[in-house]
Amino acid sequence: EMLDFLSACLRYGVSICVAGATSSGKTTVAGWLLSTIPERKRIFTIEDGSRELQLIRERDGRVTNSVVHTQTRDSENERQRIDQIALLDIALRFNPDIICVGEMRGPEANAAQEAARVGIAVLTTIHSNSSEGTYRRMVSLCKRAVDTPDDTLMGYVTEAYPIVVYCR
């Protein structure tokens, strides 16, 4: 019942952050949630380095859903480097129903919460030691991008992600 509730929230545009320690099942939960999204919804995924989410659905050799998978690319040449912030900017141009940021680890947390606060459903994962500490962790990551008071950022991230799921 809980997973069905979370799936319904995401389908209807509610952003969700899946938190937990390393190997706690965050990506598995996020992948399952995305697999329940109707084929007519446009999904844009952003993954750092390697692709873990497999969301393309096929029927009779034809793709039946609308998914854009993207990955970051590191490079010593700054012009060839593609980070999560750049991919979030690109995602917004695609008019997606859902953006999935594979894992927030740095200043991209600020760009992700901004996207979530303008009406795009954002599904993301984050490393956190507790459910209570998840929003504080988001604030600390956002501060890597902006010099905004903690209480203001706390208001932003709680508005952006009304649901936090903690995996043990």
Sequence positions of predicted segments:
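N-terminal pre-Walker A segment at the start of P-loop NTPase domains
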Residues: 1-7
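Switch/coupling sub-region of P-loop NTPases
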Residues: 3, 13-19, 35-158
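P-loop (Walker A) phosphate-binding loop of NTP-binding proteins
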Residues: 9, 21
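Hydrophobic positions on the alpha1 helix immediately C-terminal to the Walker A/P-loop
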Residues: 29, 33
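Conserved NTP phosphate-binding and transfer environment spanning the P-loop NTPase/kinase superfamily
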Residues: 157-158, 162-168
